[in-house]
């Protein structure tokens, strides 16, 4: 049973003025929002990753690697100075 789904063909959507009016606003807006999210540092706060200047402290200049999988929680606490 062949038939049509009743949807508009993709070529009609791409050539419509309405599509480009909507997307000429939304695509740059998403780009600007993403740029602001990263450049203001909010991405670091939301995802909990250290900022580039926080990877190495004055006390610890080596890479913070977890080496023992069974005592990883203790290593994380030690590396992040959580007591």
UniProtKB/Swiss-Prot annotation:
Regions that span the bilayer: 21-35
Signal peptide range: none
MF terms (GO), sorted A to Z: electron transfer activity; heme binding; iron ion binding
InterPro entries: PSII_cyt_b559_asu, PSII_cyt_b559_asu_sf, PSII_cyt_b559_CS, PSII_cyt_b559_N, PSII_cytb559_asu_lum
Major localization listed first in the record, in broad terms: plastid
Protein function: This b-type cytochrome is tightly associated with the reaction center of photosystem II (PSII). PSII is a light-driven water:plastoquinone oxidoreductase that uses light energy to abstract electrons from H(2)O, generating O(2) and a proton gradient subsequently used for ATP formation. It consists of a core antenna complex that captures photons, and an electron transfer chain that converts photonic excitation into a charge separation.
Entry's Gene Ontology cellular component terms: chloroplast thylakoid membrane; photosystem II reaction center
PANTHER family per the UniProt record, alphabetical: CYTOCHROME B559 SUBUNIT BETA-RELATED (PTHR33391:SF9)
Subunit relationships: Heterodimer of an alpha subunit and a beta subunit. PSII is composed of 1 copy each of membrane proteins PsbA, PsbB, PsbC, PsbD, PsbE, PsbF, PsbH, PsbI, PsbJ, PsbK, PsbL, PsbM, PsbT, PsbX, PsbY, PsbZ, Psb30/Ycf12, at least 3 peripheral proteins of the oxygen-evolving complex and a large number of cofactors. It forms dimeric complexes.
Keywords annotated in UniProt: Chloroplast, Electron transport, Heme, Iron, Membrane, Metal-binding, Photosynthesis, Photosystem II, Plastid, Thylakoid, Transmembrane, Transmembrane helix, Transport
Cofactor notes: With its partner (PsbF) binds heme. PSII binds additional chlorophylls, carotenoids and specific lipids.
UniProt-recorded name of the protein: Cytochrome b559 subunit alpha
